[in-house]
Amino acid sequence: MRRLRDYSLCLCLLLLWPLAVNADDSWRQIQTEAHGQTVWFNAWGGDPAVNRYLAWVSEEVKRYYAIDLRIVPVADAADAVKRIQTEAQAGRRQGGSVDLLWINGENFRTLKQANLLLTGWAESLPNWRYVDLQKPVREDFSVATEGAESPWGSAQLTFIARRGQTPQPPTSPQALLAFARAHPGSVTYPRPPDFTGTALLEQLLIALTD
């Protein structure tokens, strides 16, 4: 097996969120202001394990912080992005239907360029000290995050080969391209717009066009 890419799963806060978080606020003050509030978290709902985890998290934040975390499963984050844009265009600057969003790079860029994301909060999170800064966590889709996005997990794309048929599998993007050309139809991946397939092609394009 060969790992081809490391990518992050990121969360963003929307400017329509009713709780304003200032850079100089203490975390205790933020907790106090959040007490009793409802947070609408739009997240991809396609993974049963993640869904169970988020259900557990919602129970925990209710128990310990009196925050009502409402999980809104979405098939595509782009749908939530469109809803956010529509609400902003209608002049809804508070109490929007999306407070927290599990987002990918393309949708992050769209919202940030439209000035619809709250900035400056991510690195003030207590758990930011656990973030691996060797990874490109301060840039997404070639856009500086400016504290508007926090990674909450990571995953890796892995190349899997049958050793009996492929005793020396490719170990680089260049070798994978050469292998695919020499063995047409032998390399498979999820067809875009599947997220994993798109991520693979993005990584290969970046590596092969340097």
PLM regions: where:
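Short, polar/charged alpha-helical segment
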Residues: 27-35, 42, 47-68, 159
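Boundary at the C-terminal end of the N-terminal hydrophobic targeting segment
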Residues: 21-23
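Extracytoplasmic ligand-binding site segments that recognize negatively charged/polar headgroups
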Residues: 44-56, 72-79, 94, 98-210
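Bacterial N-terminal signal peptides
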Residues: 8-18
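A general structural motif
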Residues: 36-38, 184
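Short hydrophobic/charged patches on amphipathic alpha-helices used for structural packing
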Residues: 28-31, 81, 85, 173-177
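Bacterial N-terminal signal peptides that target proteins for export
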Residues: 1-9
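Short, well-structured alpha-helical segments in soluble
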Residues: 84-93
